[in-house]
Swiss-Prot record:
Keyword Cell division: yes
Function: Acts as a component of the essential kinetochore-associated NDC80 complex, which is required for chromosome segregation and spindle checkpoint activity.
Protein name as catalogued: Probable kinetochore protein SPC25
Organism lineage: Eukaryota, Fungi, Dikarya, Basidiomycota, Agaricomycotina
Span of the signal peptide: none
UniProt xrefs under CDD domains: RWD_Spc25 (cd23784)
GO biological process: cell division; chromosome segregation
Subunit structure: Component of the NDC80 complex, which consists of at least NDC80, NUF2 and SPC25.
Domain of life: Eukaryota
GO CC entries: Ndc80 complex; nucleus
Record gene name: SPC25
Recorded family membership: Belongs to the SPC25 family.
PANTHER family: KINETOCHORE PROTEIN SPC25, KINETOCHORE PROTEIN SPC25-RELATED
Key words of the record: Cell cycle, Cell division, Centromere, Chromosome, Coiled coil, Kinetochore, Mitosis, Nucleus
Keyword Coiled coil attached: yes
């Protein structure tokens, strides 16, 4: 606050001076206290105090309002932060539960992987053993195939030789046998007719039953029933064949004397 300016400039004051100057005309001393300037000064001072107080009150109210708002904002921020912390705690709990579940899953997967690796090792060992066994089997099969091929070649050579010998024997004997049906034998005879040595005389013998039968004979033999009865009696098929050949030869006028190797065959001996 600026100092108040008085109307009368200040003068050096002393008690003696004050007493002389305050002596009135009637001889009674009087003291001039200059009340009005002082009063104005006091009023100005009081007004300044009132203004300061009002400004202070206004400032206090404004600050209180700001403080209340700040406290309210801080409370809201605190509540929001607490909610965020709670959410973070819940999220952390869920995350920990998820991590625990994943840990169990990883443990199970590791156990399964270990089991699979152990199984794979066993399978590899078994596969190696099987490969070795397979190689051994292949060698044996190859050796067996080579032996079988050798035997097949031998059998083929023997078959070719037997076929040639059989053909030569059939031509020499004038007799050929082949199966036409189950348990039926077709017998062809040649070298019977001297005018036509290649002429065939044939007969079919059915041996499928206990009683033999002849379903076909070309050319027919008049004594065939007797020959069949004799066959079923003595069960000597070779003797039956010789008797049939003789019967075929008897069909030719003026049959020649036996001249084939078949006629010279004696056949197996049988006791009746």
């Amino acid at each position: 606050m600026a100092p108040t300016t008085y109307a009368v400039p200040p003068r050096p004051a002393s008690l003696h001076f004050l007493l002389e100057s305050s002596t009135s005309k009637n001889g009674v001393p009087s003291l001039d206290l200059r009340w009005e300037p002082f009063q104005r000064h006091i009023e100005s001072f009081l007004n300044a105090i009132d203004a300061y107080t009002q400004a202070a009150r206004t400032e206090i109210v404004a600050r209180a309002t700001d403080h209340t708002a700040a406290v309210r904002d801080l409370k809201a921020d605190k509540e929001e932060m607490e909610r965020g912390i709670q959410l973070q705690r819940e999220s952390e709990g869920e995350m920990l539960a998820t991590l625990e579940a994943e840990r169990h899953v990883v443990a199970d997967l590791n156990a399964s992987l270990s089991h699979l690796q152990s199984s794979l090792t066993k399978i590899k060992e078994k596969s190696s053993a099987l490969d070795a066994e397979l190689q051994s089997e292949r060698k044996e099969v190859k050796a067996m195939q080579a032996e079988k091929e050798r035997q097949t070649n031998v059998l083929n050579n023997m078959r070719e030789r037997d076929t040639t010998e059989l053909k030569q024997l059939e031509e020499a004997l004038g007799w050929r046998v082949e199966g036409i049906k189950q348990d039926q034998l077709l017998m062809r005879f040649t070298l019977i007719d001297p005018e036509d040595p290649a002429r065939e005389f044939s007969i079919i013998v059915d041996v499928s039953k206990q009683v033999y039968s002849v379903p076909n004979c070309d050319p027919p033999i008049p004594s065939l029933p007797d020959l069949v009865r004799q066959l079923n009696f003595d069960r000597d098929l070779f003797a039956f064949i010789k008797r049939v050949r003789i019967a075929f030869r008897a069909l030719i006028p003026n049959p020649p004397n036996p001249s084939t190797k078949f006629d010279d065959l004696t056949g197996p001996s049988r006791s009746r």
